[in-house]
């Protein structure tokens, strides 16, 4: 299992005060159109999030987990995936769903309790949202192991918040992935 880690206290800055890429910083080779598309997706999901929080606070919608501040991480990581890769979201990954082709209408239906909101179209390769903390981690690991055993060349990304790291499912899923060298990417968002 490969690990990429940086010191969480280390400041990460890509652009200088004038908006130019800082010297010595590696940035992905993206076209201007790709960057604009990603920015528009981040803005759209932020606006959706603001509206959904408003609906929830008005009592017009039940539980809703805001994602404010995570738009960039979600949109960028989803763009790094290939079409055949799989996503195992926690309950905040509305931006990932949008990039993968899941409509925001379907996301809203899910959080409003409508049964159509829980149906995931086959072409988006997203498993249903896992609300209990960390329960999607063993599922992602198991699916990636099955794919590996079948000789497939797919990646499986599993999103979770920092609270999941205190759960048994987190440790079991990562241990299994390490032992069997599964093609699983574990994406931990710091929700603090």
Regions found by a protein language model. Give the residues of each.
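N-terminal glycine-rich anion-binding loops that anchor highly charged ligand groups
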Residues: 12-19, 40-53
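Short, proline-centered helix/strand-breaking motifs
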Residues: 183-184
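Short, contiguous, helix-prone interaction/anchoring segments in small proteins
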Residues: 31-40
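Short, functionally important structural connectors and interaction interfaces within domains
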Residues: 6-7, 22, 40, 53, ...
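Thiamine diphosphate
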Residues: 189-192
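Charged, compositionally biased N-terminal leader segments and the immediate start
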Residues: 1-27
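Short coil/turn segments at secondary-structure junctions
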Residues: 26, 33, 126-127
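Cofactor-binding active-site loop characterized by glycine-rich and histidine/acidic residues
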Residues: 47-50, 54, 58-180
């Amino acid at each position: 299992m490969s690990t990429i880690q940086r010191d969480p206290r280390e400041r990460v800055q890509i652009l200088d005060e004038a908006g130019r890429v800082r010297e010595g910083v590696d940035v992905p080779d993206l076209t201007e159109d790709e960057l604009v598309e990603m920015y528009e997706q981040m803005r759209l999901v932020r606006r959706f999030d603001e509206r959904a929080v408003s609906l929830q606070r008005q009592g017009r919608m039940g539980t809703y987990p805001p994602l404010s501040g995570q738009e960039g991480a979600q949109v960028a990581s989803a763009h790094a995936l290939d079409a055949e890769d799989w996503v195992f979201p926690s309950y905040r990954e509305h931006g990932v769903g949008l990039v993968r082709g899941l409509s925001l209408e379907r996301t809203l239906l899910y959080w409003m309790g409508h049964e159509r909101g829980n149906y995931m179209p086959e072409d988006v390769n997203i498993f249903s949202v896992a609300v209990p903390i960390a329960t999607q981690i063993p599922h992602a690991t198991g699916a990636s192991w099955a794919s590996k055993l079948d000789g497939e060349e797919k990646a499986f990304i599993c999103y979770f918040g920092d609270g999941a790291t205190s759960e048994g499912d987190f440790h079991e899923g990562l241990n299994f992935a390490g032992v069997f060298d599964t093609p699983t990417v574990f994406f931990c968002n710091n929700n603090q």
